Design a protein with these regions (language model features):
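PLP-dependent aminotransferase class I/II
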Residues: 3-163
């Protein structure tokens, strides 16, 4: 419980520029922090977007279902009707080559899931072979409401061709 209190205090301080004891005159800054408060303009946009959330998630799911059914790879996301699919990932043998070929055809891909233990902040001497192998192979393909039917067909066709 003592640790929980310390963690809570640390998180509260980080949320407001690292400042502790914000209500008193004897505040201090013990760590680097940020200002995570949302301004009114961003909040207004967020409220409007929230009204569209179900519709947008359904579009993501529709695209993901097509990918799950039509992309001919053994290792890809399995369709789950409860997932929002803000990203859709696949595993390819040569990620760099796959991304270059897709880019030449006008399809943006991404690498969103680099293994955490390889970042400087978390760097350790631990070897996680499976995590590292997946980290070198995972790539995301477009899965957003701006895609039209021909975009989706092209992504499926070229993913099957280049993977």
């Amino acid at each position: 419980e003592k640790n929980d209190k310390k963690i809570r205090e640390s998180l509260l301080a980080k949320r407001w520029c690292g400042i502790t004891n914000r209500n008193g005159v004897n505040y201090d800054i013990k760590q680097i922090g940020n200002n995570y408060y949302m301004n009114e303009f961003s909040a207004a946009i967020g409220l409007v977007q929230l009204k569209k959330l179900d519709t947008l998630n359904n579009i993501h799911r529709k695209i993901a279902k097509r990918y799950s059914q039509e992309i001919k790879l053994n290792t890809k996301m399995q369709f789950d009707k409860n997932c929002s699919y803000h990203l859709y990932w696949i595993l390819v043998k040569n990620r760099n080559e796959f991304r270059k070929k897709m880019s030449k055809c006008g399809i943006e891909t991404g690498t969103h899931y680099k293994p955490i233990h390889t970042f400087s902040l978390y760097k350790s001497k631990t070897k996680l072979k499976n995590t590292e192998n997946i980290g070198k192979s995972i790539v995301t393909i477009p899965c957003h409401p701006g895609l039209n039917e021909s975009d989706i067909e092209k992504i499926i066709r070229l993913t099957n061709k280049f993977s």
